[in-house]
Swiss-Prot record:
It comes from Deinococcus radiodurans (strain ATCC 13939 / DSM 20539 / JCM 16871 / CCUG 27074 / LMG 4051 / NBRC 15346 / NCIMB 9279 / VKM B-1422 / R1). GO terms for cellular component: cytosolic small ribosomal subunit. GO terms for biological process: translation. Residues 251-264 have a biased composition (Polar residues). This is Small ribosomal subunit protein uS2. The lineage of its organism: Bacteria, Thermotogati, Deinococcota, Deinococci, Deinococcales. Belongs to the universal ribosomal protein uS2 family. HAMAP family: Ribosomal_uS2_B. InterPro entries: Ribosomal_uS2, Ribosomal_uS2_bac/mit/plastid, Ribosomal_uS2_CS, Ribosomal_uS2_flav_dom_sf. Residues 228-264 are annotated as: Disordered. Keywords: Ribonucleoprotein, Ribosomal protein. GO terms for molecular function: structural constituent of ribosome.
Length: 264
């Protein structure tokens, strides 16, 4: 039994790729057709890659491995953070700072600085500082929290990274490749499959698609530790009305493609 059904993929719009003018020729093997200037991803191949990728994630999770979640595009940020927090995994949802992996020792010094500032603000010692300095330190703390707060508990390099949109997160992918860290990615038609170890070919722009794949990755990690979630994080929220409206136009195409892809 597959981790995700064809029906789920279709309903989430996972099959909708980019415009035909925005593509990577290396991705051709995962393309089913072209409709009205949009590439349609072959969901039969997506299902096969889901099984391969999720088998790896399940095995890694059962061995206690650490997966770094990466998703800095607007529509992925909240989903990626919630799933990472739910599973107790590190995450990056703001700008990827160069050297997060390849210069991890230096990155740890920034995390140490964040912890130092947290201690200062959580005690009454901050009140001993002049007002101008308090404002400056608060700004520094906020900036560090935004950029490295999600990896503050990552005491070593991750065993793998899970990326939403590897084309946007090119620096993260390059650093992982350089260090031999496996890359798992939800990758659209503009992606280069050659730099991804475990690819899930699919729509990396639509919220429903991102949520389906990322939430299922989270489920695998939770299941691997006996169904225990990180109590510090809430469930994945439903997408906003605006997001639903933006995707309503895809529903008719989904219905038309259900039979053709389901039988292919």
């Amino acid at each position: 039994m597959s981790y995700i059904s064809m029906k789920q993929l279709l309903e989430a719009g996972v099959h909708f790729g980019h415009e035909t003018k925005r593509w990577n020729p290396k991705f051709k093997k995962f393309i089913f057709a072209e409709r009205n200037g949009i590439f349609i991803i072959d969901l039969q191949k997506t299902l096969k890659q889901v099984d391969r990728s999720f088998d790896y994630i399940k095995d890694l999770a059962e061995r206690g491995g650490v997966i770094l979640f990466v998703g800095t595009k607007k529509q992925a940020q909240e989903i990626v953070e919630l799933e990472a927090r739910r599973t107790g995994m590190p995450y990056v949802t703001s700008r990827w700072l160069g050297g997060m992996l390849t210069n991890f020792k230096t990155m740890r010094t920034r995390i140490d600085r964040l912890n130092e500032l947290d201690d200062l603000f959580e005690s009454e010692r901050i009140n001993d500082r002049p007002k101008a300095e308090r404002i400056q330190l608060a700004s520094e703390r906020e900036r560090l929290l935004r950029f490295v707060g999600g990896i503050r508990k990552m005491n070593r390099l991750p065993d793998a990274i899970f990326v939403v949109d590897p084309t946007k997160e090119v620096i993260a992918v390059q650093e992982a490749n350089k260090l031999g860290i496996p890359v798992i990615a939800l990758a659209d038609t503009d992606s280069d499959p050659d730099v991804i170890d475990y690819i899930v070919p699919g729509n990396d722009d639509a919220i429903r698609s991102i949520q389906l794949i990322t939430h299922r990755v989270g489920d695998l990690l939770v299941e691997a530790r006996g169904g225990h979630e990180d109590v510090s994080a809430g469930p994945v929220e439903e997408q906003s009305d605006e997001a639903q409206a933006a995707e309503q136009g895809t529903e008719g195409d989904t219905a038309q493609l259900t039979s053709s892809q389901g039988r292919s």
